[in-house]
Design a protein with these regions (language model features):
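Divalent metal-cofactor coordination and adjacent catalytic microenvironments
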Residues: 1-110
Length: 110
């Protein structure tokens, strides 16, 4: 169980009532990815959010986790094909919602 998101909560919020092994594993991966990205943005403990910032960050982290969970089955973004026929897809910041909460805590995250 993460500080800001939990794999089981991700599955509930995604509407997955009877997750497959693959869905459960993906939810665990998403939890680790979001938690790791937030820890990195907080400089691995060098910056500590206030109580109100923690509440906002928890909500934003769940939105980010849901977006990342759904991205696996519904890839989106800009798709380009190179002259050699290779697919190039632009990604998105996995902390889109959380970044606005994290920036006042650690302005150095850019």
């Amino acid at each position: 169980m993460g500080v800001y998101v939990d794999a089981a909560d991700i599955l509930v919020q995604a509407g997955v009532s009877a997750p497959s092994a693959a869905e459960s594993a993906w939810a665990d991966t998403v939890e680790d990815a979001i938690e790791g990205a937030i820890a990195h943005a907080l400089d691995d403990g060098a910056f500590t959010p206030s109580t109100s910032q923690t509440a906002a960050l928890t909500a934003a982290a769940m939105l980010d986790a849901l977006a990342l969970f759904e991205m696996r089955s519904a890839p989106h973004g800009v798709l380009s094909i190179t002259p050699d026929g290779e697919v190039a897809r632009l990604g998105a910041d996995p902390l889109r919602a959380s970044r606005t909460v994290l920036y006042p805590i650690n302005p150095g995250i850019g």
